[in-house]
Amino acid sequence: VQDTLITILSEKTLPIPELDREIQAVRGFNVIATANNRDKGVNDLSSALKRRFNTVILPLPDTIDEEIDIVRRRVESFEAVMDLPAEKPALEEIRRVVTIFRELRQGATEDGKTKLKTPSGTLSTAEAISVVNNGLAMSGYFGDGRLNATDLVSGIIGAVVKDPVQDQVIW
């Protein structure tokens, strides 16, 4: 796969040997790729492939309020597009998810009194958004239309437990 990407990025062509064809990229062709530092795959990117990308590191939001605001805005835009039969999520439920994610990422509770095991997954802001969106769908289609902890729990489990063996102690 990496060799194919190098050809595409360097020569701006996609060879298709089975069809004895090559497809030339149009002007302005770009590839945008994302990666998480904690979410590593089986093979690291080769140095040749790394040289063909510009790396932009996006840190996690500095404060919990900043992260809550990001999640709230993205969830509201998702809800508007999907037209879910659920009420606008309560800020307290978004705060609950973001707090759980931040505490697990940091390996300690917000007050610093209790140490926690960190999971193998990233628990990114994007995953928090996904958990709340999933909870909204659950509450809208299978619940009473009001987002609550019961609607969120399956999404939280899925985000936290990426490796059932390694993450068993966390859950």
Question: What does each model-found stretch correspond to?
Answer:
Residues K12, K40, K50, K88, ...:
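Context-gated lysine
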Residues I8, I100, G155:
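Short acidic/histidine-centered micro-motifs embedded in hydrophobic/aromatic stretches
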Residues G140-W171:
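C-terminal engagement/docking regions of AAA+ P-loop ATPases
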Residues I68-V71, V75-D151:
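Conserved AAA+ ATPase small/helical "lid" subdomain
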Residues V1-L84, L136-Y141:
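Canonical AAA+ ATPase core
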Residues Q2, Q24, Q106, Q166-Q168:
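Residue-identity detector for glutamine
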Residues P59-P61, P85, P119, G158, ...:
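Proline-rich intrinsically disordered, low-complexity coils
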